[in-house]
Design a protein with these regions (language model features):
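Alpha/beta enzyme core
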Residues: 2-9, 22-147, 163-165
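A glycine-rich helix N-cap at a beta->alpha junction
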Residues: 13-17
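Thiamine diphosphate
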Residues: 152-165
Length: 165
């Protein structure tokens, strides 16, 4: 941490990691967006809420505002950096409770120009059957999307869930 990885001569791309911009901000004025761009990375991974419960309770936002934050954050980073991955935080929890909204968040990221959608089992509590069914639904709804998976191992199922995806 704190080293200039580019100076190491690695051939991998270095991506900055951060959240979507804050509600009420413009991307040009948002400290998170400016931090991501200012790091001068090869691209960015931006995480955003896909679980309606977290949008409304943790962020205190309405669902449409969250969609706009995702779309606008991705679009800004795409314009500034080129490569953008959208990390769909708590995707499988959101899909379980409100599948249409979780999918709409992914659509907003695609509309913003996301190069990849990373589906996250952020609390590590999903079962392989649930992960497989949700990934199939995403692939059906967004057939052109390049998908990735990010599974936590809280329940010892990260490998099984990754294979199910």
């Amino acid at each position: 941490f704190g080293h200039d990885v580019v100076a190491w001569g690695v051939t991998a791309r270095v991506l900055a990691f951060g959240s979507t911009m804050r509600a009420g901000n413009r991307p040009e004025d948002d400290p998170v967006m400016q931090g991501l761009v200012g790091a001068a990375p090869d691209g960015a991974v931006v995480f955003g809420k896909t679980w309606d419960l977290h949008v409304e309770t943790a962020l205190g936002l309405d669902l449409e505002t969250n969609l706009a934050l995702v779309r606008d954050s991705v679009a800004y980073l795409k314009d500034q950096l080129g490569l953008v991955l959208f990390d769909a935080e708590h995707f499988f929890d959101g899909y379980r409770d409100h599948p249409d909204y979780a999918l709409r968040v992914l659509e907003a990221a695609v509309e913003g120009g996301a190069d990849r959608l990373v589906l996250c089992d952020t609390n590590g509590g999903s079962l392989p059957e649930q992960v497989g069914a949700a990934v199939d639904a995403v692939a059906e709804r967004l057939p052109e999307a390049v998908l990735g998976i990010h599974c936590h191992n809280d329940s010892g199922l990260a490998t099984a869930n990754t294979l199910a995806a």
